[in-house]
Amino acid sequence: MALRRGPGLYPFLALCVLGAGYLLASRLGYLDRLQARFFPAAKQAVRLSPGDFPAGVAAPVADLASVPLRPTLIGFTARGSAAALLLATGGASSLDNPVAPAGAAQGLLKTAYAMDARAVVFATDEELRKALAVGAEHGGVDMAAISVDRLAAWLPSLRDAAPRTVMLVGRSRGQEALAAVGVPDLASLRGKRLGVYPSGASYYFSLWVLSRAGLRMTDVSWVELPSTLDAGRALREGRADAVAGLWGDVELAARDRGGAVLATTADAPHLVATVLVARGDYAARYPDAVRRVIRGLLDAGASVQKEPGPAARLLGEVAPYLGDPTEAIRSAPPATLADNRAFFGLSGEAPVTYDELFQSASALYQKIRRTAVTPPAEDTRDLGALKYVSEARGP
């Protein structure tokens, strides 16, 4: 039986020719030219930003300057471990009033390391994030003391700043607390209103508390607070049944209403760790300044541990809401060189390392859709300066 060509052969051949023509035109770039000529709006607009390039591309070609000619601005939110920073800089200033504090000339960084540095206090973590994002050249800061979980949550929005962790400042050992009124235990938080500032370390702590109690995020009604410092007020005013915030604030509020503190970071002393991060452009341009800051903070931390009085006075002036400043320092003491070595895996052992803490916080915030995908922990730290100081000081 002879084969006969059906009516579909010619359309099939035509489709083959069109397909081959499309592939050829695509390879030769004709399609892109036609799109650019007749449909220019359809071409994707690509936004370039400083984060697309290495942070140090604008550093001087010749010898790098030791320190900047202007003051180095280090941002922080008040907590016990900030006592070392205050002692190193002689006090605190603000972006609204950048005048050097009265004791700046007596700060350890000035007297021991000939470096002009200022500690800039912020009322909220979100304000600190914005200041780090823009940098000191544009009304922000060069460095910032922030918790590791905050860095994990903020890193996508700080891409252009290219922040790098350079040292451990301290850990919370009771500074964060969850207090409640009419709630006898953690399991009884189910169905209650939980007030917390979502951009602070207290939020991360509250998530850990829920996991410890076997509760889901949907088991409580979240009340978003404008700042960590609003936690005590929210509990007093009855806007929340429980709040997470600073011990000195929430413990007093709970006691005033017959409530109690249900949990603190003393139950998880390796959960909230404050680290010093430097903008990538600053660290690349002034590597010696980073080393001097690390030395100064370690020296100041040692002085605080030996005699907390002077640092406690400075802390009390800056943050009276922390309560007794000496107790605030005890619940979040400045980190030592040994703490830094263990935390970053340089020597010794730590129950939780920087990499573990960053990766777990990053995974958690992605899980609850609080942040985008972040780079691995090793890409967020620069330990060159810390290693230099560590080797110089010996075992």
Residue ranges and their predicted role:
Residues 1-17:
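N-terminal Sec-pathway targeting helices
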Residues 63, 183-187, 218-219, 284, ...:
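Proline/Glycine/Serine-rich low-complexity intrinsically disordered segments
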Residues 48, 56, 359-395:
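Conserved C-terminal helix/tail region of periplasmic/extracytoplasmic solute-binding proteins
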Residues 26, 111, 211, 255, ...:
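Short polybasic/polar patches that bind polyanions
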Residues 16-28:
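Hydrophobic alpha-helical membrane-insertion segments, chiefly the h-region
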Residues 149-150, 223, 229-323:
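Pocket-lining segment of extracytoplasmic ligand-binding domains
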Residues 286-371:
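Secondary-structure end/capping motifs
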